[in-house]
Every structure is written in structure tokens, then in C-alpha cells.
Amino acid sequence: MKTLHLLRHAKSAWDEPGLPDRERGLNKRGERDAPRMGEALSRRMAPMAVVASPARRAQLTLEGLCRGWPALGECDHTVDEGLYTFSADDLFRWLLDRDDRQQSLFIIGHNPALTDLANALAEDDGLANLPTAGYLQLALQIDHWRDMRQGCAQIEFSLFPRQL
């Protein structure tokens, strides 16, 4: 069995017209929510390496998580260009190529890719929208990432900033 941890980047800033999408940072709410989510997640799970989108808002979200969850900051995190996508199909293909030695993956990415992926993998759970800085833990009934398919997962846990 595999476990997939999905976290949408925290609320991004839109106050600089003309700034490329990849370069947008976080607004005040995003800066507040990321550490709070890190602190809340630290009470529930062990720290692990995170793979994040190269978008600045995803990187700042990871930094905020680590401020709220210092042990997470001690893990080796990576940035992967494949996570800068808004397509669930692209994200699905990216996951199929993961190393099977990884039993759990924690990724920070973007909507609508994350919501659509969660709904495809956990069909019966029907998530309307993964909010900014929202977290999902999915249990996948597979032994190999390449065997991932629609309906192979259940949402085991969710946490959204408004719950804190």
C-alpha cells in the first residue's frame, strides 16, 4: 500500500500585475496559514521529504510549513518541474514514474490538478475543492506507483486552514 500526501500551496498574491505566474508569492493569509498548517500536521505525522513545485508560492509554502514544523525543515526536500502543472493528467503521469522504494510521497502543487487528482483516485469521496494550504492524505490500494488507477484510493485524512 502507498500513501500520497497532497498539499495545495498557500494563498498567493495577485498584487503585482505582469508578474509571471511562477514568480507570484504569498499574500498575508498565505503567510499566516502555511506555518499554522505545519504546526497542525506536526502533531499528526512524522516529518518526511517533500517534493514541491518550482513556483515561488509553492516554495514559500514549504518554508512556512517548516517554520511551523521545525523537524520538517531537517528533511531533504526537492523541487520538481513536473509539479508545476494545473493538469491532473500530467500529475498522474508524474506519479506513475515514482520509485517504488518510496512508500509515501508528500507533494506541494497547484489546483485544479490536486483536486482533480484526488477526485479521480478517491472517486467515492467527492472533494469539491482543495482550498489553498489544504492537505489531504490518501491511502492507495497499490504496491507499485505504476499500478495507480482511477478509484484506487481513499481519503484517510484532510485538514484545511479554516479548521485551525
Label each PLM-derived region with a short phrase.
Residues 2-81, 127-128:
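Active-site-proximal alpha-helix that buttresses catalytic centers in soluble enzyme cores
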Residues 18, 118-122, 149:
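Short, flexible helix/strand-to-coil boundary loops that buttress conserved ligand/catalytic motifs
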Residues 58-59, 88, 114-115:
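Short, well-ordered alpha-helical microsegments
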Residues 61-65, 91, 117-118:
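Hydrophobic packing residues within well-ordered alpha-helices of enzyme cores
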Residues 98-106, 111-134, 142:
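Non-DNA-binding regulatory cores of transcription-related proteins
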Residues 124-156, 161:
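Domain-level recognition of soluble alpha/beta enzyme cores
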